Amino acid sequence: MAKRFLLGIDDSQYTFEALENLAGLFLKSDVHFHLFLAVTESHLPAPPPTSSEATDWQEVQKRRAQQILDKGVSSLLQIGYKRSRISTETRLQSVNAAQDILNGGKSEEIIAIVLARKQQSGVKRLLPDTTTANIYQYADVEPVWAIGNLPLKPPHVLAAVDESDYADRIATHLAETLGPLPDVRITFLNVMPAKPPSYWDDGHILDKEERGERKGVVKEWQWTYEEIMGGIFAKARGVLTKSGVPEERISTKMQTRRSGPARDILAEVSRGGYNIVALGRRGSGDSQIDPGSRASKIIRSARGCTIMLVN
């Protein structure tokens, strides 16, 4: 069965760069693209002064929208895609572009919603595009990919996982989408959480004997956690090898918390030269993509990387 991506497009340069980046990665696989254009009134050119009929203005809207879609189709054809692998859809006079894109994803049986990461700097980087932010927030079923400006070939993925069931979902999504690609490399990273307060806050200073006992309790907690993560890593590895990823292209890392989960993950992104970061929308400590969540911090700060948000 063909894999279908829904790409929410607009007329920005970022969109077409993202389309070409992603399309180049999947050219030789059975991937189809559904180009979805949700046009809000604010994104349409002003009506010409000579236009007096509403029907004339609607035709102007349709032509402009079709030009954007045609440009996307042309880009894919030039890369080498057959027209049968491309479909298009337009939603004119959209009131909520994010919701229209999400609804389009549900109706098209897609493998992921794809958007362009609009690279910004300074304060603007902390305030993501409204449509993108809303899709991150409310895409509770479909995975969301935000394509960065780093080349995706060859794909080098850092999958940040914890002890929640998102590790299984991330592994499954990676297997379905990137598993068949010949040069993919995937690293699963776990940042061990801080010790629970009950292990260090007793309301009094521990004496020598109590400190010795506490060390044993903490070591047992760490051993149990490592055993749990070892099982999660093994299961994820099995899912990927079954999809065709060679064993030697899968690695796992576990480290103690240093600066905090998000900063530790970002530090590994910088060290490892990854071009894709895969995250769960809700980890064991996050309920949603809010400004202070781990996922939100990584989305804002992983410069140039493509972000996969698995729901």
Protein language model regions, located:
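A short acidic, glycine-rich active-site loop
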Residues: A54-Q67, G212-G231
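Short, solvent-exposed amphipathic alpha-helices that sit
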Residues: N21, Q61-G72, D100, E227-A236, ...
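Short, flexible loop segments at boundaries between secondary-structure elements
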Residues: E142-L152, I299-N311
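Glycine-rich, Arg-bearing micro-motifs that act as flexible, cationic patches
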Residues: A112-N134, K153-P154, A262-R263, S270, ...
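Extended, hydrophobic interaction surfaces within ordered domains
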Residues: K62, Q66, R83, S94-V141
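Small/aliphatic-rich secondary-structure junction motif
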Residues: M1-T55, P155-K219, K242-V245, S251
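General small-molecule cofactor/ligand-binding pocket signal
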Residues: H34-F36, S87-R91, W145, T187-L189, ...
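Structural beta-alpha unit
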Residues: S74-I113, G238-V277
